[in-house]
């Protein structure tokens, strides 16, 4: 099991890394905008200054070619630390497949079903990020979805890991 921090506030992340239980950091454009900083500066601080070993970097783009181009940029710049965060859309899944082929780690976000998680795993995703809180907010069982995905992944010996996202509380 791993715990990832969802933030772009460097001093908060640095403080929490001292606990020794944080395995990585996930970011997104909204969090970076709230930080008031330029995305590349945030990523450089996370990786180079405070030494985060696994940073999910959400790339811009609507179509696979743009997602791939942006994924390559960060995937090659920080080979050992960058995990490229892509949307679970047909274009995102195409990009995932290509980036996986190139040896670049991926985190598929906006996963809301077992079927989506399976497609991401088949494309070679390193992580799938089911949105637990959003599912719960809409009357669905987010943790139940995690259980179902885990069952399918375990049964099929899938290497893709599940990274629960959008968790609203620790209960």
What kind of region is each of these model predictions?
Residues 2-14, 19-21, 27-98, 132:
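Active-site beta->alpha loop and helix N-cap motifs at the rims of alpha/beta catalytic domains
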Residues 6, 86, 109-110, 165:
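Short His-Asn-centered micro-motif
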Residues 25, 32, 110-111, 165:
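Long, contiguous hydrophobic alpha-helical segments, chiefly transmembrane helices and signal peptides
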Residues 90-96, 105-107, 114-171:
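Catalytic alpha/beta core domains of metabolic enzymes, predominantly
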